[in-house]
């Protein structure tokens, strides 16, 4: 596959659930901000053409990266919500990106994406007229709570999935979905929800359980544990679980903050 897919990374949020002075995407793990691993995971795929990062106005923590693994990294101003940031990124993509081209959307603080998962998402999603998302089947027993905190019942889990990212959609359809949701005053919590609102049915592509989002200190500790115990990238472990972030060289990132996570630091 040639580099034809752009990825949008919404990174304008403050991560209030995590606490602390830094937005969670800039928290350090293995000596580098989480977002360095996120961008490296995306850029490792040959189909990726570039990355658009939606950052907050006046973001003093943005390292100023302009490329990763020779793939361009562009920035635009994000909005007050995730949906607004993604829409801003969609509208700011280069003129070469057509309306019916597929685009990826990936969480800035979801740094543990495996190359095999991204490859499978692109292969399946680009064969569908709508697109697809990475997701994981719900395996725990689900309880429905009453107002008093008691259990009102047990929910069937056979058809329930947890939505992950990346999510892959055609540019013009996602713009329409996000725009209509905003006009209706509906806060969508992921891009698939915006697509559902306009009557479209994306596919579910099963992804790895360890493609988690860092939202709490425990999540950060889990990712640091993953780094400390990870083999050094593709070729040294089962390729189905290889994480390209492990083998990114220190010269992979360009721009003012051009240090990237190298294997010697992991």
UniProtKB/Swiss-Prot annotation:
EC number(s) for this protein?
2.7.7.60
Instruction: Determine if Metal-binding is one of this entry's keywords.
Output: no
Listed under catalytic activity are:
2-C-methyl-D-erythritol 4-phosphate + CTP + H(+) = 4-CDP-2-C-methyl-D-erythritol + diphosphate
Residues marked Positions MEP for the nucleophilic attack (site): 157, 213
Provide the alphabetized UniProt keywords: Isoprene biosynthesis, Nucleotidyltransferase, Transferase
Pathway noted in the entry = Isoprenoid biosynthesis; isopentenyl diphosphate biosynthesis via DXP pathway; isopentenyl diphosphate from 1-deoxy-D-xylulose 5-phosphate: step 2/6
Any one Gene Ontology molecular-function term assigned to this protein's record: 2-C-methyl-D-erythritol 4-phosphate cytidylyltransferase activity
Transferase as a keyword? yes
Q: One of this protein's GO BP terms?
A: isopentenyl diphosphate biosynthetic process, methylerythritol 4-phosphate pathway
| Polar residues compositional bias, start-end | 243-252
Q: Where is this site: Transition state stabilizer?
A: 17, 24
Question: Where is region (Disordered) located?
Answer: 229-266
Among InterPro entries, the record links this protein to: IspD, IspD/TarI, IspD/TarI_cytidylyltransf_bact, ISPD_synthase_CS, Nucleotide-diphossugar_trans
- Note the superkingdom of the native organism: Bacteria
The UniProt entry's sequence similarity note says: Belongs to the IspD/TarI cytidylyltransferase family. IspD subfamily.
Q: Which HAMAP family match?
A: IspD
Q: Which NCBIfam families match?
A: ispD
Describe the task this protein carries out.
Catalyzes the formation of 4-diphosphocytidyl-2-C-methyl-D-erythritol from CTP and 2-C-methyl-D-erythritol 4-phosphate (MEP).
What is the protein name stated in its UniProt record? 2-C-methyl-D-erythritol 4-phosphate cytidylyltransferase
Q: Which organism is it from?
A: Xanthomonas axonopodis pv. citri (strain 306)
């Amino acid at each position: 596959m040639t580099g034809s897919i752009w990825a949008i990374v919404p990174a304008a949020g403050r991560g209030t659930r995590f606490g602390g002075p830094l937005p969670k995407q800039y928290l350090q793990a293995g000596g580098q901000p989480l977002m360095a691993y996120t961008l490296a995971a995306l850029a490792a795929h040959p189909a990726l053409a570039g990355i658009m990062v939606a950052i907050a106005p006046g973001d003093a923590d943005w390292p100023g990266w302009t490329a990763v693994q020779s793939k361009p990294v562009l920035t635009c101003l994000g909005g007050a919500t995730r949906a607004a940031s993604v829409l801003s990124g969609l509208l700011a993509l280069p003129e070469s990106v057509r309306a019916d081209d597929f685009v990826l959307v990936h969480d800035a603080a979801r740094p543990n994406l495996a190359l095999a998962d991204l490859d499978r998402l692109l292969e399946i999603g680009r064969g569908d007229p709508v697109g697809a998302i990475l997701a994981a089947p719900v395996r725990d027993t689900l309880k429905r709570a009453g107002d008093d905190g008691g259990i009102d019942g047990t929910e069937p889990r056979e058809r329930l999935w947890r939505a992950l990212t990346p999510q892959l959609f055609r540019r013009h359809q996602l713009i329409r979905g996000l725009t209509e949701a905003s006009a209706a005053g509906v806060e969508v919590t992921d891009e698939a929800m915006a697509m559902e609102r306009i009557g479209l049915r994306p596919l579910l592509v099963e992804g790895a359980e360890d493609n988690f989002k860092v939202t709490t200190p425990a999540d950060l500790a889990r990712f640091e544990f993953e780094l400390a115990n990870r083999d050094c990238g593709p070729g040294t472990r089962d390729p189905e679980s290889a994480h390209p972030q492990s083998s990114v060289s220190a010269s992979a990132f360009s721009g003012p903050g051009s240090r990237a996570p190298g294997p010697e630091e992991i």
